[in-house]
């Protein structure tokens, strides 16, 4: 590939860029997912190194089961944090804060492992009935607003991170925009990596406290460490006496959460399909993507790592770089595995300024929403049709409103705004009269994704 065409044309085979460039692109994806992935264990009491190890292994397993066709990275899922905390809570302090017993995390991990198996059940249904019968319920008027909502619902975390230091965040944003718009050659397709490095260095230069924090974190970390905490694993749980009541409680608390994450998985695969211009819903198919996500979650949980999920951050990187080769994602997965054995490098990345993460995330989440807009426009959705307006309006308002006001609790099931919006959108599309979309005969734009099956 000529240097002048890099960043201006889609790249489906990154081998044309050369191995050094592929490694740098993989590093960019690793940095994009790192902030959110290490936050999950921090909030749930699990281990960061174990999380990174099984984010990498889970991603490679997903790619194996999806024939290496889907450029998705599997990071740690936020959807199960409430489940982990519910299982390990043993009381409350005088101020109302929870008292946690991390020895109970192995029970929670068992519950998540069973939740991962629920994906296999849905995967089997897709295989038996075929994607054609299922995907009629996911026309562009449903998938487009859902993809838009994915980016918008993630945006609050980006803004929160930016507030830590708006100057550093703005520097990150300007670097990303500058290189993506006016960069030449390789610089044009690694704007996120350059934004992270540039704003990181800027923060260290202008902020003595940040400089001291990074130095302390890196100097105290070891060069090598084993990334598995045995006491959090399900194997350790069954190596001794097991509280069957606690085991059932963990399963009943956590497994229902998989209903929401499976709906979100479908939205994520639609987003990746729209970004790359390929119909991954048909080839390799939802039955394979669900199987890969579910087994990755079960495997991670057995060893005491958080549940895995397809990551929106990396979808944003795909949209920005226009390099869609899954090989690059697999390189990122291998880097994550290596980093999990090196606490010093993990500490260096973990010490990344919060505002830096916020700045690059703001761009990435915006790119996801822009992909949703493109999906609607290129599939020529008619917004003079009241039916379409109602469906899109409710998906967007429910997703954003519930996200900012708190999830809906139905018994032990906690439904996120995106899950509720997806369910409502699917139901309205199935129930409301006046469909103007025929699944097998979609009138698409010249550059739209062919969603026909």
Where are these regions (language model features)?
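Intrinsically disordered, low-complexity non-transmembrane regions of multi-pass membrane transporters
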Residues: 1-24, 211-239, 274-278, 431-453
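N-terminal signal-anchor module of multipass membrane proteins
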Residues: 1-74, 78-102
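Membrane-embedded helical hairpins/re-entrant loop segments and their flanking transmembrane helices
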Residues: 11-20, 40-63, 67, 253-326, ...
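Membrane-embedded hairpin module used as a gating/binding unit in multi-pass transport
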Residues: 33, 199-301, 305
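Juxtamembrane helix-boundary/capping and inter-helix hinge elements in multi-pass membrane proteins
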Residues: 43-46, 87-103, 139-140, 274-284, ...
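Short, non-helical or kinked segments that cap or interrupt transmembrane helices
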Residues: 46-51, 68-81, 134-143, 188-194, ...
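Interfacial segments of multi-pass membrane proteins
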Residues: 84-91, 180, 314-329, 335-340
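Membrane-embedded alpha-helical modules
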Residues: 104-210, 333-442
